[in-house]
Swiss-Prot record:
PANTHER family: FERREDOXIN, FERREDOXIN-3, CHLOROPLASTIC. One of its GO terms (molecular function) is 2 iron, 2 sulfur cluster binding. Expressed in roots and leaves. Its main location: plastid. It comes from Arabidopsis thaliana (Mouse-ear cress). The gene is FD3. GO terms for cellular component: chloroplast; plastid. Binds 1 [2Fe-2S] cluster. Belongs to the 2Fe2S plant-type ferredoxin family. This is Ferredoxin-3, chloroplastic. [2Fe-2S] cluster binds at C98, C103, C106, C136. Keywords: 2Fe-2S, Acetylation, Chloroplast, Electron transport, Iron, Iron-sulfur, Metal-binding, Plastid, Transit peptide, Transport. Induction: By nitrate. Residues 61-152 form the 2Fe-2S ferredoxin-type domain. It is found in: Plastid, Chloroplast.
Length: 155
């Protein structure tokens, strides 16, 4: 997961060592603002948000869903967000039931890209080898293209 957590103390003060005496120099401090953290994180394709005195950065990937009738929906998904949740936020209507990876209602098949679906328990190794994915427990690990509505193909 591409998340970086920085405590407020490490963001606001850095202590330098003197090269000649190897003693701590505590009278100098350097500030790193959340604003500059956001700017730098965007250059690496990360989103940054402030939270309780720190900053959190997540990678963001493009996910394209290909529906059974040829419709295409593309939206951004953070690497710590399930694809189904992001689809709903983007206004995409997908089938689901358990939201826990314990059934096959939300099944899709990966055309390209990688996901982490270690939270799921329903799919067998043979399904995973064929690229099947449960969108309710799948975190993107790259840009992805996924065919949706694949539950009937699992049986």
């Amino acid at each position: 997961m591409a998340t970086v957590r920085i405590s407020s103390t490490s963001m606001t003060k850095a202590v330098l060592r003197s090269q000649t005496t190897n003693k701590l120099i505590t009278n100098k401090s350097y500030n790193l603002s959340v604003g500059s953290t956001k700017r730098v994180s965007r250059s690496f394709g990360l989103k940054c948000s402030a939270n309780s005195g720190g900053a959190t950065m997540s990678a963001v990937y493009k996910v394209k869903l290909l529906g059974p009738d040829g419709q295409e929906d593309e939206f951004e998904v953070q690497d710590d967000q399930y694809i189904l949740d992001a689809a709903e936020e983007a206004g995409v209507d997908l089938p689901y039931s358990c939201r826990a990876g314990a059934c096959s209602t939300c099944a899709g098949q990966i055309v390209s890209g990688n996901v982490d679906q270690s939270d799921g328990s329903f799919l067998e190794d043979s399904h995973l080898e064929k690229g099947y994915v449960l969108t309710c427990v799948a975190y993107p690990q790259s840009d992805c293209v996924i065919h949706t509505h694949k539950e009937t193909e699992l049986f």
